[in-house]
């Protein structure tokens, strides 16, 4: 699974996921499913935000990468992916600037057009079950919830899906492709079922013991499917900005 994640996702997303797991004391070598889930969630958050801007008239517009316009403002503020201290600093700044009610839990995004925080969910289960779990945890009508599944289903607060159909279809297609690629490598069942994941981990550990000391040959080739799977959605200028702000090392 770890190899799949490193081949499948944008390097910046992998780096952010590693940082997040380290912050919470989790070992990505053991919690490989969580590593994959975090990367998937991060990518959906970035895809949700990318190419969406607010023009000088306050209208929401879509601008593809490479169309420069200094008067445009990003519609969404990305909170997910930042360390907790910085994330809360961003949330507090948004609340002070916009007058929005401070959420009890860290949300994933802030929508400057609708003036609301957004909680993004990506589930391997039924969307309505995961939606209810999120709603019960957040207990706030102010935070908008939007859930996506790997089967193309989605559910949002008051059936308000925020994004246009094409943008949402892009996210659904990406999730479905990830599922198909996992399945083709025999990874999907263990990703869905914790019990299956434990069984697979024991099997892997046992096979590692049996193979200890044997010469190994590692292939670094990328399959044609994974070449097309690699996301090309990120705005290159914004990628550089995000990398600088999200991955900045604290001064000693």
Swiss-Prot record:
Active site, per annotation: 80, 108
| GO terms classed as biological process | viral RNA genome replication; viral translational frameshifting
What lineage does the source organism belong to?
Viruses, Riboviria, Orthornavirae, Negarnaviricota, Polyploviricotina
One Pfam family named in its UniProt record = Flu_PA
What the protein does comes down to: Plays a major role in the shutoff of the host protein expression by cleaving mRNAs probably via an endonuclease activity. This host shutoff allows the virus to escape from the host antiviral response. Hijacks host RNA splicing machinery to selectively target host RNAs containing introns for destruction. This may explain the preferential degradation of RNAs that have undergone co- or post-transcriptional processing.
Protein name, please?
Protein PA-X
Reproduce the free-text note on domains from the UniProt record: The probable endonuclease active site in the N-terminus and the basic amino acid cluster in the C-terminus are important for the shutoff activity. The C-terminus acts as a nuclear localization signal. The C-terminus is recruited to host protein complexes involved in nuclear Pol II RNA processing.
Task: List residues traversing the bilayer.
Answer: none
Site residues by UniProt (Important for efficient shutoff activity): 202-203, 206
Query: Keywords for this entry?
Result: Decay of host mRNAs by virus, Eukaryotic host gene expression shutoff by virus, Host gene expression shutoff by virus, Host mRNA suppression by virus, Host-virus interaction
Molecular functions per Gene Ontology: RNA binding
Q: Which domain of life is it from?
A: Viruses
Enumerate the InterPro entries for this protein.
PA/PA-X, PA/PA-X_sf
Q: Outcome of altering residue 108 to A? A: Complete loss of shutoff activity
Mind telling me which residues the site (Important for efficient shutoff activity and nuclear localization) is annotated on? 195, 198-199
The record's family statement is: Belongs to the influenza viruses PA-X family.
